[in-house]
Amino acid sequence: MAISKEDVLEYISNLSVLELSELVKEFEEKFGVSAAPVMVAGGAVAGGAVAAAEEKTEFDIVLTDGGAKKIEVIKIVRALTGLGLKEAKDAVEQTPSTLKEGVAKAEAEEAKKQLEEAGAKVELK
């Protein structure tokens, strides 16, 4: 005997709030989905405030100071960007300079870590 949609709905309607919450969590885990409400594009001004609160996913790596160990920083800049020696040297000496744009968060944080370990000052925007 097959279970109909009506049977499922009837069963769910008889669950307590706690049982329903546990059921939702199990659905999320089993099917890899989220029960978070879907945001609709556009709308009132409040929608813009919510969008600003969302976590940024792309970053620009901006070198604000080359630091004292410029040769090490230039080597790292070349490795990160693929620039030639002269271009990398100019980027390190003429700060602030944007090294990369639209970079994923993990890559941006790793680049910042490498540059700061070499003595440079970096901002992620």
Curated annotation (Swiss-Prot):
Gene3D superfamilies linked to this entry: 3.30.1390.10, Single helix bin
Residues that span the membrane, as ranges: none
Molecular functions per Gene Ontology: mRNA binding; structural constituent of ribosome
Keyword Hydrolase: no
GO biological process: translation
Lineage of source species: Bacteria, Pseudomonadati, Campylobacterota, Epsilonproteobacteria, Campylobacterales
Family listed: Belongs to the bacterial ribosomal protein bL12 family.
Listed PANTHER family: 39S RIBOSOMAL PROTEIN L12, LARGE RIBOSOMAL SUBUNIT PROTEIN BL12M
Subunit structure of this chain's protein: Homodimer. Part of the ribosomal stalk of the 50S ribosomal subunit. Forms a multimeric L10(L12)X complex, where L10 forms an elongated spine to which 2 to 4 L12 dimers bind in a sequential fashion. Binds GTP-bound translation factors.
Keywords attached to this entry: Ribonucleoprotein, Ribosomal protein
Name the UniProt record assigns to this protein: Large ribosomal subunit protein bL12
Functional note: Forms part of the ribosomal stalk which helps the ribosome interact with GTP-bound translation factors. Is thus essential for accurate translation.
One Pfam family cited in the UniProt record for this chain: Ribosomal_L12
SUPFAM superfamilies found in the cross-reference section: ClpS-like (SSF54736), Ribosomal protein L7/12, oligomerisation (N-terminal) domain (SSF48300)
Keyword Ribonucleoprotein recorded: yes
GO cellular component, one term: cytosolic large ribosomal subunit
